[in-house]
Amino acid sequence: MIRTVVLLLLGNLWFTANAQSDVSPTGSTDSLSSKYTLENCITEFSMDKIVKTDAGYQFWFVDKDFIDGRTLKMSVVAPHQATHAPHVHAEDEFFFILEGRAEVFLQGEWKSVGPYTSFYCPSNVEHGIRNPGDKELKYLVIKKYQK
């Protein structure tokens, strides 16, 4: 129950944060009603659509081409692995740990965190995430790519 509520709140917060950008100057959303339908606004997880990585896999719930560069991705990292080394990029990111333990890195420091923990990474700041545990690490990443 808590997981469902948290995920609904995350999704609602993320998608409504920029909702006004899709409204025309007259306040009309007619073009949106034809662009966004139940067929393309619902994404169910499927192992057939995962993207394998060296450390596990990723699943894109929302691709950057769907809505103005915003994405929602789930990453699954095998025990004692990291998707990549700490790095820097122009986009900020918001991580939300679903399952397992994570070690998160920000500006030279590591911290161990568990499920239902968020981790915000500002743009152009070195950051990273890895799985120090014996079980899979599963987390969501919300990111908005630059145009």
Task: Label the predicted regions.
Residues 109-123:
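Short acidic-glycine-tyrosine-enriched beta hairpin
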